[in-house]
Amino acid sequence: METTSEKQGRILLVDDESAILRTFRYCLEDEGYSVATASSAPQAEALLQRQVFDLCFLDLRLGEDNGLDVLAQMRVQAPWMRVVIVTAHSAVDTAVDAMQAGAVDYLVKPCSPDQLRLAAAKQLEVRQLTARLEALEDEVRRQGDGLESHSPAMAAVLETARQVAATDANILILGESGSGKGELARAIHTWSKRAKKPQVTINCPSLTAELMESELFGHSRGAFTGATESTLGRVSQADGGTLFLDEIGDFPLTLQPKLLRFIQDKEYERVGDPVTRRADVRILAATNRDLGAMVAQGQFREDLLYRLNVIVLNLPPLRERAEDILGLAERFLARFVKDYGRPARGFSEAAREAMRQYPWPGNVRELRNVIERASIICNQELVDVDHLGFSAAQSASSAPRIGESLSLEDLEKAHITAVMASSATLDQAAKTLGIDASTLYRKRKQYGL
C-alpha cells in the first residue's frame, strides 16, 4: 500500500550545514514527506543515482562546490526534479541566476518553517500537476502517431499486433529510434484484455543499475542510505496490466537474472526486503539494438532474450514507408497550426519533394519535430523548404544508397550527431530527439560524442 509520503513526494535536501539539514528534515517529515539529505555535491549525485526525487532544496554555498555547477549536474541527472535554491541575503543575485539556469524558486536564509512548508507544498503540487498534464498530452498527442499507414509492411505489423494483443504472450518490438515502438506498445495494451488496468513504462537508458532495481521492484525503508520510506516498484504498479520495458537493450546486465526470474515465475523481492511477492504482469519490450549480437558479445542474456521474443514485431523505418510521409506531415501540420494559432495550411511542392527525398533517420519522431518547428516559424499559407531546415538536394545526398547496409546504432549515432550540430543547446537537442537530457547524456557517452 502506498504511504502518505509516497503520495506527497520525495524531497532531497542539499546543504553543508548539519543544523539546517536537521531542522529542514524534521519540518518536512512532520508534514509526511519522504526526505533524504546530502551535505556535499558528491553525496547528492550518489543519491540521485539511486533514487528518484520530485523536489530538491539546494544551498548555493556548498563549501568548495559551486551551487550553480551542482544545479547544472542535477538538470542532467534528474531533469524532471524541481529545484528550489536556498541562499543568504547577500547572494540573492546569484539565486536569480540559478532560476535562469533552471531552478524554480528561491528561499532566503533564515527561512521560517511555514515558508519551507509552503514552498514544498507549492512545488510538489506543480510537479504532480505537470506530470499529469504531460501524461495526458503525451497520450493525446501520440495516440496512433505513425500507426495509421498505407504501407503494406506496416499494415502487416499492425495486423499481427492486433492478433497477439488478445493473448498474454510477451512481445518484443524492434525498430529504429523514433519509428513508433512506444506507440505500438500502447496500442497493444489498449487492444488487450488488460486495457482497463495500468500500462507502466520504464525507460531503461535513463536509470542506473542501482536505481533500476529500486524502481522496478521497489525498496523497503532503510534498504540503503536515504531510503526513509518503503516504496512500490513499477512491477507492483502494473499488477494486472502491462509493463513496457522501453529500450530493453540498455537494461543492466547485472539485473537481468532478476528480471528473467520475474518473467518466468511472476515473483520478486523489494530491495532490502526478503518477502517474496507476486504480480500478474504482461511484458512488452522494445529496442533499436541488435540483441542477438549483444548476446554473442556477452552483453545480454540469451535466456532472457528467449523469454522476451515469444512474439517479435519489426517496425519498418519511415524511409521504407514512403507512401506515409506526406500524410503524416499533413496530419502533424494540422495539429500544430491549431495548437500554436499559426497561418500555415499546407506544403509547397518543393517542400513536399524534400520530405519525400529525405531519409528520416529519426523516423516519425523526427518528422513530427520538423513539422512542429516549421509550423511555428512559417508566417505564410504554405510551408516551404526553408521552414523544414533542409533542401531536396541535401535530402537526396544524405539518403542511404541502394544496397548500403547501416546498423541501427550507426543510424542513431548519425541522427544524434546531426541534431546536436543544428541545436543551440543540449536541452534543445534532447527535445528535438524526443528524449530527456539524461538519456541524451548516456547516448553521447555510448557513441563517444
Swiss-Prot record:
GO terms for biological process: alginic acid biosynthetic process; negative regulation of single-species biofilm formation on inanimate substrate; phosphorelay signal transduction system; positive regulation of cell motility; positive regulation of DNA-templated transcription; positive regulation of proteolysis; positive regulation of secondary metabolite biosynthetic process. It comes from the Bacteria. SMART domains: AAA, REC. The keyword Cytoplasm does not apply. The keyword Nucleotide-binding applies. Residues 426-445 bind DNA. It holds the Pfam family HTH_8. One of its GO terms (cellular component) is protein-DNA complex. GO terms for molecular function: ATP binding; ATP hydrolysis activity; cis-regulatory region sequence-specific DNA binding; DNA-binding transcription activator activity. The modification 4-aspartylphosphate is found at D59. Residues 10-124 form the Response regulatory domain. PANTHER family: ALGINATE BIOSYNTHESIS TRANSCRIPTIONAL REGULATORY PROTEIN ALGB, TRANSCRIPTIONAL REGULATORY PROTEIN. In vivo phosphorylation of AlgB is not required for its role in alginate production. The mechanism by which it activates AlgD appears not to be mediated by conventional phosphorylation-dependent signal transduction. This is Alginate biosynthesis transcriptional regulatory protein AlgB.
